[in-house]
UniProtKB/Swiss-Prot annotation:
The keyword Transmembrane helix does not apply. The lineage of its organism: Bacteria, Bacillati, Bacillota, Clostridia, Eubacteriales. It comes from the Bacteria. One of its GO terms (biological process) is methylation. This is Ribosomal protein L11 methyltransferase.
């Protein structure tokens, strides 16, 4: 990026970060940054605990989170702002607590965005094995550690959001050497990459966003793996065969819509790992899963979020 850019930001809450990030990824923006004070406040800070975040978010004392999208001066910013406001309002009407939900815009120079934020994004360790590392950082794995290389400048998820973290932990528990994994809404490809690193035989990531598909493919190219496919489209329309595990880190309403397709895509006794579920929507997802013949095995919680692990009976 060179020259001057327009930063469009949404002031929100931690539980709304993922869906609001999705708004920006539906636009032709040049990058997305996520600032979540809850990832920093109250933690012992070390080289493996920082996600990317502007240090100024500490001033909010955990009250707000921010999603920022970056656009060129040639873009019609008034239209962008109007669209983002409309989509945020739709999220509010769906029952999601978006906090302030205000949309702001500011002119930024390249140095303000493209370089400074990188100082605050360091390798993140999840569980005992998985380390998510930005491509420009050096990290020497020890013991059984497995490193996932990621370019967070294009990523939908960076690894330290509660929903991503719980999905990684569930994959660590259920992925075996002969496992086939489907990752719905693959975004940056982070969960597909984790499944591959954990030893899955074959992994397929699918996404309806062509920008996400390109991002996932690029991130896969940074990692020494050859068993991941990334496909554009709906799950059953583009994927052949069945999986032993389906993972989906998306919002509860979409999970409920997808349950029937997931059922058709899973082998008998297959595992469905799903997160992105706020507490108020947890029972809705459980009821839908049980209605469609799944047995709920685990309900894990982290902050405002839930991860449900279910088996197809």
């Amino acid at each position: 990026m060179e020259g001057t850019w327009i930063e469009v930001r949404v002031i929100t809450k931690s539980e709304a970060l993922e869906p609001i990030s999705g708004i920006f990824y539906g636009l032709d923006c040049k990058g997305v940054a996520i600032e979540d004070p809850n990832d920093i406040l109250g933690r012992e800070q070390g080289p493996l605990t920082w996600d990317f975040a502007d240090i100024n978010i500490l001033e909010h004392k955990g009250k707000v989170a921010v999603v920022k999208g970056y656009f060129s001066e040639e873009d019609n910013i008034d239209d962008v702002i109007a669209y983002v406001k409309e989509r945020v309002e739709e999220l509010k009407e769906s029952g999601l607590d978006v906090g302030e939900g205000t949309v702001e815009a500011e002119k930024m120079f390249e140095e303000d965005w493209a370089n400074n934020w990188k100082k605050y994004y360091k390798p993140i360790k999840i569980g005992e094995k998985i380390v998510i590392k930005p491509i420009w950082e050096e990290y020497e794995p020890t013991g059984e550690e497995m490193v996932v290389e990621l370019d967070p400048g294009m990523a939908f998820g960076t690894g330290d959001h509660e929903t991503t973290r719980m999905c990684v932990q569930a994959l660590d528990k259920y992925v075996k050497a002969d496992t086939t994994v489907f990752d719905i809404g693959t975004g940056s490809g982070i969960l597909a990459l984790v499944a591959s690193k954990l030893g899955a035989k074959h992994v397929v990531g699918v996404d309806l966003d062509p920008v996400a598909v390109d991002s996932a493919k690029e991130n896969i190219s940074f990692n020494n793996v050859d068993n991941i496919e990334v496909l554009y489209g709906n799950l059953l329309d583009v994927v052949d065969g069945k999986a032993d595990i389906v993972v989906a880190n998306i919002i509860a309403e979409i999970i409920c819509i997808l349950v029937d397709d997931v059922k058709k895509a899973l082998n008998k006794d297959g595992i469905f790992i799903t997160s992105g579920i706020i507490h108020e929507r947890r029972q809705m997802v459980i009821d839908k899963l049980e209605q469609e013949g799944f047995e709920v095995m685990e309900v894990n919680k982290d902050g405002e979020w839930n991860c449900i692990v279910a088996k197809l009976k």
